[in-house]
Amino acid sequence: KVDDKLLYLGTRLHGTPKYMEGVVRAAGKYCDVISINYYSRWSPELTTAIADWANWADKPFLVSEFYTKGVEDSDLNNQSGAGYSVPTQNERAYAYQHFTLGLLEAKNCVGWHWFKYQDDDGTDNSSKPANKGLYDNSYQLFPYLSFFARELNFNAYDLIQYFDK
């Protein structure tokens, strides 16, 4: 029996499985939306992976995790995590807009989620802390990243219309 009032995302596909036709086809059979953890990329793979997901699953996808680390000016060692790395906090903002503009251009993407609200704890030396958050460890919003994300998010529907021309 199926509850048609629920949205089923299934398990989040990450790593190699998200590139495997059989896995994506199986997810498409049961999921309403394919959930993807999408890391280590400057640009979404519009003509390869994203096109494959559309063909294999015949369902939209949601990027359930992504982030970019600023490695030179975050006061964290940034040795952990799968996020794409750029030199500075300002470049994290550019990376956000670049990546999400690509997702808006994809006809089968229904949204995205930045992985983490706050950076990893910089005092926890056991876990190799990284710059993953929208906020630093003093609860200060990264201003440039916030501005660029807000600017893109407020204009998302107009941008979709532009890409649909």
For each of these PLM feature ranges, what is it?
Residues 115-165:
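Aromatic-rich peripheral "rim/lid" segments of glycoside hydrolase catalytic domains that contact
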Residues 30, 53-56, 81-84, 131-136, ...:
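Short, low-complexity, polar/charged sequence segments that are solvent-exposed and flexible
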Residues 3-81, 97-101:
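Glycoside hydrolase catalytic-domain groove-lining segments
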Residues 1, 81-87, 139-140:
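Short, exposed beta-strand "edge-strand" segments with a Pro/Gly-rich flavor and a Y/T-containing core
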Residues 82-134:
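C-terminal structured "cap/appendage" subdomains that terminate the fold
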